[in-house]
């Protein structure tokens, strides 16, 4: 057990982006992950392709995950946020090459309507989606991402009006 923990800590973080996508009512897009039996809700996120800027990656990932890029960036996080995945998930994610993700987060105003959202994309990540209030967001998020989400909410909260 010690060796696997040590190995876990030696792994790097995967660079990525996260998107807090707001609708006109300032509710936040959350999707339920398709690859797990537990109720694992999260905001859209994804990796950064080499040579891609974080803002370009955020808009690309938005299109890939929710089927729409109708929106614009309101703000970018001031720092990189990171999280570790539980050690039992490491072999199942990213070929076991990363301990978690370090992410630049973006607050995005969605300018489309619900009909523009299509989670049945070529590589779907969600099997359900909904708009969540800021108050309920932290209670429905998968626990190992909660601390990161608290930090993102704290940074963007004053901009959500």
From Swiss-Prot:
Signal sequence annotation: none
GO cellular component, one term: cytoplasm
EC number of the protein: 3.6.1.-
InterPro entries: NUDIX_hydrolase-like_dom_sf, NUDIX_hydrolase_CS, NUDIX_hydrolase_dom, RppH
Example of a GO biological process term: mRNA catabolic process
MF-aspect GO terms: mRNA 5'-diphosphatase activity
Protein family membership: Belongs to the Nudix hydrolase family. RppH subfamily.
Function: Accelerates the degradation of transcripts by removing pyrophosphate from the 5'-end of triphosphorylated RNA, leading to a more labile monophosphorylated state that can stimulate subsequent ribonuclease cleavage.
Protein's recorded name: RNA pyrophosphohydrolase
Native source organism of the sequence: Rickettsia felis (strain ATCC VR-1525 / URRWXCal2)
């Amino acid at each position: 057990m010690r060796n696997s923990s040590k190995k876990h800590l030696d792994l790097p973080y995967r660079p990525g982006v996260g998107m807090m996508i707001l609708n006109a009512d300032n509710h936040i897009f959350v999707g339920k992950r398709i690859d797990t039996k537990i109720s694992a809700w999260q905001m859209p996120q994804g990796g950064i392709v080499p040579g891609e800027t974080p803002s370009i990656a955020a808009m690309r990932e938005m299109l890939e995950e929710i089927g729409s890029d109708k929106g614009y960036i309101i703000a970018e996080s001031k720092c990189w946020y990171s999280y570790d995945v539980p050690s039992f998930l490491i072999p199942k994610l990213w070929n076991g090459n990363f301990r978690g993700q370090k992410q630049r987060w973006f607050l995005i105003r969605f300018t489309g309507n619900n009909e523009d959202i299509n989670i049945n994309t070529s590589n779907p990540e969600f099997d359900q989606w909904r708009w969540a209030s800021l108050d309920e967001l932290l209670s429905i998020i998968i626990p190992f991402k909660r601390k990161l989400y608290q930090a993102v909410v704290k940074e963007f909260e004053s901009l959500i009006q």
